[in-house]
Amino acid sequence: MSFVELHCISNYSFLKGASHPEELVRQAIAQGYEGLAITDECSVAGAVKAWRELRRLRQEAPEASAFKLIIGSEFHYEGNCFVVLAPHKKAYGELCRFITDCRRKADKGDYQFSPDALNENIKQGLLLWRPKQSDQEFIPALTKIFSGRLWLLLELSLSEEDDSERELIQTLSSAYNLPVVSSNGVKMHAPERKRLHDALTAIRFNQSVDSIKDRLAPNAENYLRPLNEIHEIYPSFTIQESLRIAAKCAFELNEIRYQYPKEVVPEGDDPSAYLRRLTYEGAHLRYPQGIPENVLATLEKELNIISELQYEYYFLTIFDIVDYAKKSQILCQGRGSAANSVVCYCLGITAVDPTRASLLFERFISKGRDEPPDIDVDFENARREEVIQYLYRRYGRERCAIAATVITYRPKSAIRDLGKALGVDLLQLESVIANYGWRYRGQDWIDEVITPQVSQDNHILTCFKELLPELLGFPRHLSQHVGGFVLSAGPLVELVPIENAAMEDRTVIQWDKDDLESLGLMKVDVLALGMLTALKKCTTYISEITGKTFSLESIPKEEDSQVYDMLQRADTVGLFQVESRAQMNMLPRLRPEKYYDLVVQVAIVRPGPIHGDMVHPYLRRRHNLEDPDDVPLPELKPILKRTFGVPIFQEQVIAIAIVGAGFTSEEAEELRRSMASWKRRGHMGKLMDKLIINLLKKGVPLEYIQRLCRQIEGFGEYGFPESHAASFALLAYHSGWLKYYYPSAFCCALLNSQPMGFYAPWQVIQDAQRHGVIVLPVDINNSYWEHRLEPHSDNTKEGALRLGFRLVKGLSEEAACSIIQHRTDEGFTSLVQVMHLPKINREDLEALASANALASLGENRYQQRWECSGFLYYYQLFSECEYINIDFEPPSRLDNIYEDHSSTGVVLNDHPLAYLREANLTPQCLTAVELLKQKAGLKTYVAGVVINRQRPKTSTGVTFVTLEDETGSINILVWKKTAIAQMDILVKARLLMVYGELDKDEEGRVAHVLAHRLTDLTPHLEELESRSRDFH
């Protein structure tokens, strides 16, 4: 018995298919099918996943070697279903272009289709048609144009509609002499998925399952049936027809041949020679004193490999993008594995000298890796769109699009959608979701969340618990990658369909980065980084202050001990990559003294080193408490020397696998890929087994191997390669240097680059004030839209930081621009002058009054707000009316705190804790400054506004909380036991009092409190809406 299923959708027909493409391929092979067509609706989004799984199975299972995967797509029109199959490469390109046309004519997530469009555009593809009725207008034209390429699709579901289905097919077959082929109309790989398919249908219609029963499939027959059942249900000639159609289909995705864009090479130039010329021109700029011999040797080695692998166009494409950005004064920097390349450094793509950081080019490109290199480039987030639109202009929308990101169901979204489908009380469900400690969930979290509190119906609870694991990880829709662009020499629409993104002027292909990598398509990552915006603004301000051009290159190359001293104190609010509570906790322990220490610092607070229990051994060896030369095998010393014998980076783990466990370069590459995708797929079993067995044979202690394996799994969660950390460490140092030497300019740049980082503007300003920055309030006569530096007698170097109108909540930028445009050198002298300005309304005026931005016009903010609320408007209109003057009492100190915070989010020169302390509402509580003067071990109380909460994925389950009082920041460590016991207070309190034990670093410069008991003081500040930065 033989059969090929020609109509099958996966879960990439979003909310319609109930099985992953991989499940469908595995099941079809297990059932003994000769082939399977993946025909998602107006899409080929699931095709590469199916192809990749088949490729894997062909290597492992002999029965999969002859299995045929056919690529196609289905389209629906007025009850008809049309399935287009691609018999060869030309037909596949035609199908991709047709899908693109259908998608581009509709909003995101939808498509426009008609039989006429099908007739006009599909000249090579094969067409299967499941008709709605026999007298439709389009039928004569369809049968004529698709003569010899058209089949009627017979799909029987063992329901009462089967008889009418047979009759319709027979009528049309006789009338137009059309062959008939059988199909199961597959929507799931096994009948057990019927309940999930019903739930997905309900989610799609935004209804409960019970309310749409008439729209649900009558049974579970739309699955990959066993062959014997297929032969019992369908006439044999319709089954044989499936084999004949499959025989016509020879196309496989590996036939796709990608070509790099060619216009980056001047006409008549050889790409290899052109790349060499640009590289050496850049090398002379990078090394003005002469190119060192080791750099010359590395350059030649890299250029030869690039030429041998024919990657010149790739490097030149990236160079072209970076060159455009630099000419447009857009700050950018390459990172990731590209930082291993001296060629990238000389071309100006990356900023880290690989010879300085001892990075390995083979991590970036090697002959053993059958894939193009991956270069990530960060651009100022405020100006990245300019770079994106440049790419569209240069290559056109047919040859340029953004890669997709598959948005999948995570716990909260799955619970919400499934709960709605099952008809549970949504308000109650939201309450459960909001109050559950997600960061502390264990393996039994489903049982902890889905309780009788969600529903009293035991049947619903059982369904909920059984369906939830199936829904988790299911694709929900396609979104755009954060910056991955695909460029091609020819029409990209003939390689993969392109559709509209949600964002205007953006287009997205239907494949994600894993799909692109599998097929060897070039992806250029055009990423946005807020810190680059801040750094660019900061250097611009310094240029204005000094009267001399200043850039990041102006920062001295020599290591600055004062900057590292600041880092060791964890004085890092606003600094790139080292401002989180977890990083602040690590800095005084690691105590970085030079650039490479900062590389380790950036990388060590990640799941890889943490899960592998490598952090404490590293710190002990770094501070000479353990022997740094003690490694399990002598041959591992060169690999681990720079990190004191402890593996910290992904590259080191891979090197250990090669040198210590005898991995081939191909196996090492597979290990690298597995680490990157383990969290999503979990395919690392065989590699781990080999690693363990071979290291044991070499005499490596089992405990060390187990830690290494945990570290590998940790990298699957999130871990930094050394090259990535090296690029980020450079930006961390740059931001630290600027903060230390130009704190006012740095603070101004951070505020003008919001939102970014861990801290809200208020916290950034409070920190700046502690560093001597003079901060002046928003003022109608002195402020601009952006925050600015203005001359001040108390700071002749940088001046004072004047807060800008952008901080005022409710004030439109248009109104602010009108104020600035019409403001004279003398400034405004009365409220009436401001009222009469164009493009400013009552809401704008009230916002300014609330923010006390009208203080220079006299009177208090309450009086001004009353006058702005409309009374003066009416008085101006009806001047004969008597003006009634109402005097408002000035706001109290606490009122001003409330008003400042609610209107701008910033309280200058005061703090809620100072008020509460003076009101004796926080007795026994030490201030941040007092805390530093105490001895470790002291049991004490502290209190503050909650600035942020962070719980990194550590083995200890610690939560870091930052409090702020009127004197500074207070670091709180909450262990898991305390966190679980007082979860509600921990996650909800905005003003927190903590009783605990004081802990300090060896030099007594950094203190934190180990929490024993938490008290919520928020009721004291009910009107103050201080928002913390939680769990980032």
Curated annotation (Swiss-Prot):
The keyword Secreted does not apply. GO terms for molecular function: 3'-5' exonuclease activity; DNA-directed DNA polymerase activity; nucleic acid binding. It is an enzyme of class 2 (transferase). It is found in: Cytoplasm. It catalyses: DNA(n) + a 2'-deoxyribonucleoside 5'-triphosphate = DNA(n+1) + diphosphate. Its main location: cytoplasm. GO terms for cellular component: cytoplasm. Keywords: Cytoplasm, DNA damage, DNA repair, DNA replication, DNA-directed DNA polymerase, Nucleotidyltransferase, Transferase. DNA polymerase involved in damage-induced mutagenesis and translesion synthesis (TLS). It is not the major replicative DNA polymerase. NCBIfam families: polc, PRK05672.1. This is Error-prone DNA polymerase.
